[in-house]
Regions:
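Solvent-exposed soluble domains appended to multi-pass membrane proteins
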Residues: 9, 16-19, 24-290
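Membrane-interface segments at or immediately adjacent to transmembrane helices
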Residues: 1-6
Length: 290
């Protein structure tokens, strides 16, 4: 069975269709992988600007907000009282996978440390596995998280599911300084700096997320085992001044499923995030029949 790596990229979405003055190269790796993907499309998520746990729980369990009722606002508060939580992780465990999560933030936040073992995760690598020197802005860099994941994969012979929850592009964006270097790397037409300061910070981190995607792709190609890479955004960022000045995004994010094997023309399919786990299982199972 293939190695499976899934990245839940903090505040990731493609802002270029909404703001055409953004340099297209900001997401050059994402564009390339999208063209090579097994499946890609827009992703409907139950969160806007925050509340990652709503998107995360829908992905891992396949449960919609309607299923959760009043617990839709913090599903893990309910899940922490359960003894076993069915979903994607349990399915992968039954298929022989060792399931681990990498998230550079305290494990107790959202009670993940209580919920994840009940989902079937074997290990949780939280902020204790990273140093303050590995920050980019306010949080651990995507580069550091990618490097950690690559080393983990390179040093095991086990059949692995690695679930990565990044933090670098988490706000508040206005607390950060403007990115160094020429703004031309972020924009083709420099916007009003007063209205776009948060956008510049966001795009700087978005470009780092794009580099992370490229790092993971290159590493998975080198593994002896075939691999599947899933990538999606949990929600759009909070950038109220940007939205008021330049327009609001739809609230959808993007996803892609890329494989090191048998990829022809990508399937285009817009999904709800609670459907994404099934799509990833399909990408794995297709390998069995080939």
């Amino acid at each position: 069975m293939p190695t499976l790596v899934v990245v839940q990229s903090e505040s990731f979405f493609d802002p270029r269709p909404v703001y055409p003055f953004i340099n297209p190269d900001v997401l050059s790796a994402f564009d390339r992988l999208r063209e090579q993907s097994w499946q890609t499309g827009a992703l409907n998520v139950p969160a806007w600007g925050a509340n990652t746990v709503r998107t995360e729980s829908a992905f891992l369990t396949g449960l919609t907000p309607e299923h959760l009722g009043v617990h839709r606002f913090n599903p893990y508060h309910r899940f922490a009282r359960e003894t076993h939580i069915p979903g994607l992780v349990a399915e992968l465990k039954a298929m022989g996978y060792r399931c681990v999560c990498i998230h550079p933030y305290p494990a107790g936040f959202y009670r993940r440390n209580e919920v994840y073992p009940k989902m079937g995760f074997d290990a949780f690598y939280d902020i204790q596995h990273f140093s303050p020197e590995q920050k980019c802005g306010q949080y651990t860099s995507d580069e550091a998280v990618a490097d950690f994941a690559v080393k983990l994969l390179e040093n095991t012979n086990e059949q692995m599911f690695v679930y990565i929850i990044t933090m670098e592009n988490h706000g508040p964006l206005h607390l950060e300084s403007q990115p160094e270097g020429p703004l031309s790397r972020l924009y083709t037409d420099i916007p009003d700096t007063n209205a776009s300061s948060d956008l510049s910070v966001y795009l700087n981190h978005l470009q780092n997320a794009d580099r992370m995607l490229q790092t993971l792709q290159k590493a998975l190609i080198q593994l002896p085992r075939p691999a599947v890479l899933g990538w999606f955004g949990d929600h759009v960022p909070i950038m109220e001044q940007v939205y008021e000045h330049y327009g609001y995004p739809s609230g959808q994010t993007e996803y892609l499923i890329w494989r090191t094997f048998s990829t022809d023309t990508p399937q285009q399919a817009d999904l709800n995030v609670d459907e994404l786990g099934v799509a990833l299982l399909d990408a794995l199972v297709c390998r069995i029949g080939e």
